[in-house]
Amino acid sequence: MQEIQKITEDIYRTTLPYKDIFTTVYALKTPEGAILFDAGSYDEDAALYIKPFLEELGITEQQLKYVFISHNHTDHAGGLNGFLPLYPNVTVLTRSRKLQEQYPEYKSERTEDGQLILGTYQVVTIPGHTKDCAGLLDVRTKTLISGDCLQSYGIRGSGTWAANIIYPAEHVEAVEKVRKLDIERIVTAHDYDPHGYRADGREAVVKNLDACITPLRNMQKLILEFPELDDVALQEKYNYDPELPKVKHQVIGAMRTAMEEKRIALL
């Protein structure tokens, strides 16, 4: 049996393999039923990891009402292929119309910012990594399950996973929205440098949100300091520090475009 981590009395976490890192699913309990947050990456994840995880927590097929997909990327939504046949009565909650179209034979609903699920979990839209990124805020314990929405400096690993934010202007606005919410804990889908997968207490939450802006600010500085360099050359400069996660040149390009179109202020 894989390790299960208890976040609160009603929020539990387990990790699943993905490339040379991992991804995460969360089980969220309420008096009205349960929610699975994300669905893993691969077809076999449901049978190997997710079903045993839910069973260990005593969550039956009848009790599981929803699977909430934080965004339509493989390591979060790819496991639906194996999951939905095992839990055919669950409703998929997503911001992605494309994801809904992939599974027309199953029930799905498109979520909206501020929507309350099972009287307990509030949808918080946090675009940036993707346009459809969203998390769930437990209004009882003030715990935000953010998935990939809040990435701090990024993920260490073989990939270029540093601050993978391709909609920087929208992300800065969303982070400021989150900053104004009453949040005392953030838990994420991956270990994000430098804070890992969780921030406990208001001070740690603020530091986590500050860390989400820092890489974007550093990219801005490079673009302004070296206007003659293209995105690939700036990528090399950003990635010079071996201790930091590595950024994609497309992320720097997205920041450059936002600056040129005056959609983002100096950070």
Q: Positions of the model-derived regions?
A:
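Conserved beta-strand hairpin/beta-sheet module of binuclear metal-dependent hydrolase folds
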Residues: 2-57, 135-147
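Short gly/ser/thr-rich secondary-structure transition/capping motifs
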Residues: 18-19, 105-111, 125-128
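Active-site HxH/HxHxD metal-binding segment of metal-dependent hydrolases
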Residues: 41-117
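Conserved N-terminal boundary motif of the eukaryotic protein kinase catalytic domain
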Residues: 119-124
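Accessory terminal helices/loops
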Residues: 176-185, 192-267
